């Protein structure tokens, strides 16, 4: 049977491979982990307002996804494309007061910008990492983000 320490490390290797990229014990089943947050891609089509509401109603709370660096954008874009095979998802950015005062739906200030200056709610293309505005009343698939 061999040495128990080698069995333990073989077992750990199996767990690491099965858990996959973005899997974490701190996130609920079906959610992916990245830098202390949990993310889930939803295939339902909802307006921006309905998608944001849906995110806040999840068991771990949350909001439509917000981005604070390029690595986070890349993680979410890859996650969205892998799960949906779709190219557009809502993100939590919109001009709440229609005065170009941009903030995320969770109240965080915009500290990373990846679009040209145009108003409305925003989507991200999961191919090409481009952010574009859409009418908030249109329906898209979406990504929720919550603290781990």
UniProtKB/Swiss-Prot annotation:
GO terms for cellular component: extracellular region. Gene3D superfamilies: Mannose-Binding Protein A, subunit A (3.10.100.10). It is found in: Secreted. The keyword Disulfide bond applies. Disulfide bonds join 27-38, 55-144, 121-136. The keyword Disulfide bond applies. Residues 1-23 form the signal peptide. InterPro entries: C-type_lectin-like (IPR001304), C-type_lectin-like/link_sf (IPR016186), C-type_lectin/snaclec_domain (IPR050111), CTDL_fold (IPR016187). Expressed by the venom gland. Keywords: Disulfide bond, Hemostasis impairing toxin, Secreted, Signal, Toxin. Residues 34-145 form the C-type lectin domain. GO terms for molecular function: toxin activity. Shows greater sequence similarity to the beta than alpha subunits compared to other heterodimer snaclecs. Heterodimer; disulfide-linked. Belongs to the snaclec family. Interferes with one step of hemostasis (modulation of platelet aggregation, or coagulation cascade, for example). This is Snaclec 27. It comes from Echis ocellatus. The lineage of its organism: Eukaryota, Metazoa, Chordata, Craniata, Vertebrata.
């Amino acid at each position: 049977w061999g040495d128990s320490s080698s069995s333990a490390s073989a077992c750990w290797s199996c767990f690491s491979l099965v858990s996959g990229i973005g899997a974490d014990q701190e996130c609920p089943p079906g959610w992916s982990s990245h830098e202390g947050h949990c993310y889930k891609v939803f295939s339902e089509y909802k307006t921006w307002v309905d998608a944001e509401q849906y995110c806040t109603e999840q068991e771990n709370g949350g909001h439509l996804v917000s981005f604070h660096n390029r690595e986070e954008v890349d993680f979410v874009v890859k996650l969205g494309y892998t799960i949906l095979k779709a190219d557009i998802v809502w993100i939590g950015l919109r001009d709440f007061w229609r005065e170009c005062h941009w903030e995320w739906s969770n109240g965080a200030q915009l500290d990373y910008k990846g679009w040209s200056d145009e108003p409305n709610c925003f989507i991200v293309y999961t191919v090409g990492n481009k952010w574009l505005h859409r009418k908030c009343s249109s329906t898209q698939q979406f990504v929720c983000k919550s603290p781990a």
